[in-house]
């Protein structure tokens, strides 16, 4: 599975997948993202052609496979 884009609100992480699905998980599961500023949350990079997401300002990484397992 590969991410196409991500967004972070005050209470959830939303990832749009390349196949059209959308993953939405509570931000509380990711303390670094939860405590990051809105600006830090919005500045992410897709890793490995969308297999992961990296937030440089807080040095945090999440894998799409891990998000799918966590949301299952």
Locate each region found by the language model.
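Motif-centric detector for short Cys/His coordination patterns
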Residues: 1-72
């Amino acid at each position: 599975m590969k991410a196409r884009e991500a967004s972070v609100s005050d209470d959830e992480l939303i990832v749009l997948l390349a196949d059209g699905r959308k993953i939405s998980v509570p931000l509380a599961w990711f303390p670094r993202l939860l405590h990051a500023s809105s600006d830090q949350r919005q500045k992410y990079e897709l890793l490995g052609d969308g297999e992961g997401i990296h937030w440089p300002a807080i040095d945090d990484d999440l894998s799409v496979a891990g998000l799918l397992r966590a949301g299952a």
